[in-house]
From Swiss-Prot:
GO biological process terms held by the UniProt record: mitochondrial translation
The entry's keywords: Mitochondrion, Ribonucleoprotein, Ribosomal protein
Descriptive protein name: Large ribosomal subunit protein mL43
Subcellular localization, as worded in the UniProt entry: Mitochondrion
Keyword Ribonucleoprotein included in the entry's annotation: yes
Gene: mrpl51
Protein species of origin: Schizosaccharomyces pombe (strain 972 / ATCC 24843)
Stored Gene3D superfamilies: Glutaredoxin
Function: Component of the mitochondrial ribosome (mitoribosome), a dedicated translation machinery responsible for the synthesis of mitochondrial genome-encoded proteins, including at least some of the essential transmembrane subunits of the mitochondrial respiratory chain. The mitoribosomes are attached to the mitochondrial inner membrane and translation products are cotranslationally integrated into the membrane. Also has an extraribosomal function, being essential for mitochondrial genome integrity. May interact with MHR1 to take part in the mtDNA repair mechanism.
GO CC entries: mitochondrial large ribosomal subunit; mitochondrion
InterPro entries associated with the record: Ribosomal_mL43, Ribosomal_mL43/mS25/NADH_DH, Thioredoxin-like_sf
Annotated GO MF terms: structural constituent of ribosome
Length: 145
């Protein structure tokens, strides 16, 4: 009896076939008059275009706020927003902060108590050689005759 192999391509049926970035919009604000916006103005004139070409699924807005320090404000699909003050930062560090905003998920930082998360935690806990204190190990020495 011979088995025939039918060549097929697996097609995702649950909607997981595409990746959507959690960050949907990034807003850059600066002031024309203030000296704290010098790095932001340099970033907007040199590096913003390359960042926008890299991430075409994110919407970029540039606003002028007179008398205010420059900000990066990121809006996420979860409804949260992250605000980073870029006062007196260089253009390269503002670029790194913009990439950080673009790549983060927008969730609140949370404390991870255990390195492994499980849906069914162990009844006895995780075994460790130091946890068995009831029976300490003994070192046996050979007695010489």
């Amino acid at each position: 009896m011979m088995i025939e192999i039918i060549p097929k391509i697996s097609i995702p049926k649950n909607g997981l076939g595409s990746f959507t970035r959690p960050c949907r919009r990034i807003e850059f604000s600066y002031c024309n008059w203030g000296g704290s916006s010098k790095g932001m103005k340099e970033f907007l004139s040199t590096k913003l275009e390359s960042l926008a070409k890299e991430s075409q699924d994110v919407e970029f807005h540039v606003t002028n706020r007179q008398g205010k320090h420059p900000l990066i404000r990121a809006y996420y699909n979860t409804g949260r927003e992250k605000v980073i003050c870029t006062r007196k930062m260089s253009a390269s560090s503002i670029f790194q902060k913009a990439i950080l905003c673009r790549d983060s998920d927008g969730l609140k930082p949370r404390l991870i108590k255990y390195p492994v998360e499980s849906t069914n935690p162990s009844v006895r806990g995780i075994w460790s050689p130091f946890s068995d204190q009831a029976k300490p190990h003994e070192i046996y020495k050979k007695k010489s005759p």
